[in-house]
Amino acid sequence: MNELKTIEVVAAVIVKNGNVLATQRGYGEFKGKWEFPGGKIKEGENREEALKREIKEELNADIDNLEFLTTVNYDYPNFHLIMHTFICSLKNDIEFVYHSKDELEHDNMIWLDKEDFDYLDWLPADLDIISAYKKK
């Protein structure tokens, strides 16, 4: 049995006026699925630095008031995901950012009340974030 590659990432539950930002993946194997924005931790970064950088890259926004929520461990078919999640707020507005010349990082974004989370088709690992957030 092969050992799954482990990928360590960070994700943001961005809260504004009581609603939470969900983003729709705009590329790759999970295109069209909904997720909390974030990405991989680079060597030499701590989790908070990585999350601030990723949100700046993906949404051209700055975040603050980071509060740790949960760490999710999830086995996808080709890799093991460790996702450290923080609740945070925005310092400025967000905008769409292109992943490459032709692909948007995110196809769509929506602000949701936590009662509306169940209406979206989420990436499986993000469902554990939703559960943790609803318990807060």
Regions found by a protein language model. Name each.
Residues L4, V72-V97, I110-D116, Y133:
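Active-site-adjacent beta-strand/loop module that shapes the phosphate/pyrophosphate-binding cleft
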Residues I14-V15, A22, C88, W111:
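Conserved hydrophobic "DFG−1" position in protein kinase catalytic cores
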